[in-house]
Amino acid sequence: AWETQDHPVRTDPAGTRRVVAELCAKCLAAPAAQGPPLVGIGLALPSPVDPNDPNRLSQVVLPVWQENLGMDSIAAKYGVPLVVDNDANLGALAEYWWGLGSTTDNLAYIKVATGIGSGHIIGGEIYRGATGVAGEIGHVSIDPQGKLCVCGLRGCLVTLAGARGLEERAGELAARYPRSSLHGKRATVHAIEEAALAGDPLGLQVINEAAAHLGTAIAGLLNIMNPAVVVMGGDLCRLGEVLLAPLRERVRSHTLISSVSAAEILTSELGPRSVAVGAATLVLKSALDDSHLFPKVDIPVGDHGREPQP
C-alpha cells in the first residue's frame, strides 16, 4: 500500500506527527496490507539522525522540533518497533538492496529535493559517521560569498540546487528569456523540470547551473569516498540525461580520472518511492540483524542480509 501527502515537516512537528499517524492508518487499512502482521515501522527524516540517540533531532536542521522526535505513540499504538534514519541514508539502502547499487558494496545516493543530502553504503553497510552527520553534502559551501543558508553558512549547495534555490534562480534569469514558457510566472520546481524536458532555454539554463553545482560537490565526494555507483534521487531524477549530461561533464573536469572512471553516475529507477522503500528495508534489515527486537517475526537461524550478486 502507498499513501503520500505533502507537508511542511521542518516547521510543523505536531502536524507532521499527525500526518504520519494518518498515513500509517490508511496504509494498514488498504486491501494490499491485509495478511501477515506488521513487523515494524520505518521512518525517514530530512535531518541527520544520531544512531546513538535517534529520538534527538538536529537543532540546526529542524529547530522547531526542539530536538524531540516524539513518535513513540505511533509505535506503541501498533505494538511494534520504530526504526529511524536519515532520508538519504534510506535512499542508499533501497538502492543497495533493490536498485542500481545491487551489484556493488560501495555506493552513494544523492537526494535532491527541498534539501540535498547523500547516503553512503561502504562495505555493504550504511555509513553514518560518529554522530550521524555523514553525508550532509547539501551544506558543503560551494560559494562562500553566496546566499545565507538556514544552517548559518553561505553558498551551501542546497541554496544553489535545492528546490527553493532553483525557483529563485528561475526568477532571477527570467528577464533574459522573454520567450520562455516560464516567463512572467512563478516557476515551481515541477514547472522548471517540465520546461527543461521540453527544451525551454530558461528551464535548461537553471538545470544546467544546478547540475554544475551538484557536479562540483559530487567530484569531491568521488575523490574522498570512491564509490562504484552514484545514484541521483529525489525531485530531479526524472530529468534523466538532461540532468546527468552536464553533471557528468562537471564531475569529469573536477576530479581525479581514477575516481571518476571507477564510478557510474545514474538516476534512480526506484522513483519517488525510493526513500519509503528504504524505510521499509531498514525494518527488514533491523529484524534480520537482531530478531529479539522484533517479537512478531519468526526468523530462521542462518546467514541474513542481501543475497550476494553474481
Question: For each predicted feature, which ranges?
Answer:
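ATP-binding/phosphotransfer module of carbohydrate and carboxylate kinases, centering on a glycine-rich
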Residues: A1-P37, N52, A76-V80, T104, ...
